[in-house]
Amino acid sequence: MADSSAIYLAAPESQTGKSTIALGLLHRLTAMVAKVGVFRPITRLSAERDYILELLLAHTSAGLPYERCVGVTYQQLHADRDDAIAEIVDSYHAMADECDAVVVVGSDYTDVTSPTELSVNGRIAVNLGAPVLLTVRAKDRTPDQVASVVEVCLAELDTQRAHTAAVVANRCELSAIPAVTDALRRFTPPSYVVPEEPLLSAPTVAELTQAVNGAVVSGDVALREREVMGVLAAGMTADHVLERLTDGMAVITPGDRSDVVLAVASAHAAEGFPSLSCIVLNGGFQLHPAIAALVSGLRLRLPVIATALGTYDTASAAASARGLVTATSQRKIDTALELMDRHVDVAGLLAQLTIPIPTVTTPQMFTYRLLQQARSDLMRIVLPEGDDDRILKSAGRLLQRGIVDLTILGDEAKVRLRAAELGVDLDGATVIEPCASELHDQFADQYAQLRKAKGITVEHAREIMNDATYFGTMLVHNCHADGMVSGAAHTTAHTVRPALEIIKTVPGISTVSSIFLMCLPDRVLAYGDCAIIPNPTVEQLADIAICSARTAAQFGIEPRVAMLSYSTGDSGKGADVDKVRAATELVRAREPQLPVEGPIQYDAAVEPSVAATKLRDSPVAGRATVLIFPDLNTGNNTYKAVQRSAGAIAIGPVLQGLRKPVNDLSRGALVDDIVNTVAITAIQAQGVHE
């Protein structure tokens, strides 16, 4: 790797929020090149690993272990600076040789600091051949003070012969951004101002519990990861406490203040009041049994923490608690990425680096492109399973990143209450309760008309429209939404059946099938059908191939279709291989411009060396991107085998053949899976609109 493919993040002080900047750089770099690494030249000597490095390693694509991504400790640097820098350079080059680009995150002033620490970082950057991205803290400073800090830092870096590529003034009050921006215009390097975001330094309920030396005595375990956005020491009467409550607040009160406990618990459960993060009972007092029983009867999921500390000590500890952005802090990570996207020209900054043109497509590159493509033309997607926490968390992320517009089905009060408890902002979503919607009876009448040949009456149709999946499908059918994603808590049949009954298939296609987008370390392949049709006929197999090629093209995959069998070319005989041969000819007749080969074995389809001996002149063999399996048994087992043995990321199943997109989730789907599936559905909907 050329040294100019690295960028060095340096700061003159602690608490500048460099991890936010580093996340944004890594996120964009992993979408540009295959192997992105991160390096920490100086770390503390500690039994615990550097949490910032662990956070950033989770967002790299070079696959290097922690031990290879660190240089020296502060102790080594203080003992012999020249030797330490030489060791840093050696360690850096050893890891950088395996990367296309590296983000180097300088020291954090977390050990015995020195007035020359920035100079040391500048000297290291010069020795690594990396331009510097200077990060300063704007919080609690006037615009002139921020400019003065930047001026001193630029001079110091220039003394070390370091090249400063850009300046970021981080953690700036929103109202001060225009003035700080103006104050930095006089400097040569481009400057960016990023606002302060309280969420990034907010402790979680679990971190607050540790800070007050407490223990969680009741409440939903999942809510211990919610961020605490404020602290109230409730020493006043209950009515004044209620006036001061805000979303995400932790309320501290002695355990014997039954009036306050009841008021706060009731407020949390009541519609129109803020959703709290937790209650902290201090003083070592236990709730009176009658009060405890009453609170329990409210069926709150709100975490309740008990501590033996007094009110002052509890409030002081809680107010000074600071949260970390760790590898599991997904909401904070999403917020950091949004801040960088909105306030820093990351693409322009990285354009200063010499980054190799990629010849492969990694999973990170592909998923980034998916989200960008979905974001380019916002579609409205309906999520029928509004009572599932995974759906709500996914919805929050999708809305925060501006990937789609959303309609969520469910009891609006319950959906929004649970979202608030999870720390999820659904302000940008429309929430509809099917049975209470003004569209309910209209949809029932329409459905009864569509299905009258099947004996469906209006009364029966009204019952069916109470089902969120059917109601969501009708929203798509009537253009109130562009697509639907379901299945987190329902079977595939429950998701697909309404679509077949209502939306129906594309003209010329009689089969609804699926593909998985298989993100291998160096490329993305489409596998079909691995989820829907057990034993396809010749005509169905041809439908699957044609639909899969169209779907692959929608996601930037040039379709070259391999019709898979146990033999290649004319070498095999029998009913199974004859079916594949006939389906291949049918595809050629229906889509003469589509490159297709079959029957062909898997290795001959994807390995050029095998193809050279078996099908030398084929435009598909050895280069296939769309692989069509002869039956569901083969397809399903193959995709799972490749997923497990090759470490591939399987995105799907992506349903195809419908007039409008409806996609199914695995009941074990993770939040990332749901986000990707919604993005895919949005891209399919964009194709329908074209």
Swiss-Prot record:
The N-terminal region seems to be important for proper quaternary structure. The C-terminal region contains the substrate-binding site. Pathway: Metabolic intermediate biosynthesis; acetyl-CoA biosynthesis; acetyl-CoA from acetate: step 2/2. In the N-terminal section; belongs to the CobB/CobQ family. Transmembrane segments: none annotated. The gene is pta. This is Phosphate acetyltransferase. Its EC number is 2.3.1.8. GO terms for cellular component: cytoplasm; extracellular region. The keyword Cytoplasm applies. Residues 365-690 are annotated as: Phosphate acetyltransferase. It catalyses: acetyl-CoA + phosphate = acetyl phosphate + CoA. Keywords: Acyltransferase, Cytoplasm, Transferase. InterPro entries: DRTGG, P-Actrans_bac, P-loop_NTPase, P_AcTrfase, P_AcTrfase_dom1, P_AcTrfase_dom2, Phos_Acetyltrans/Butyryltrans, PTA_PTB.
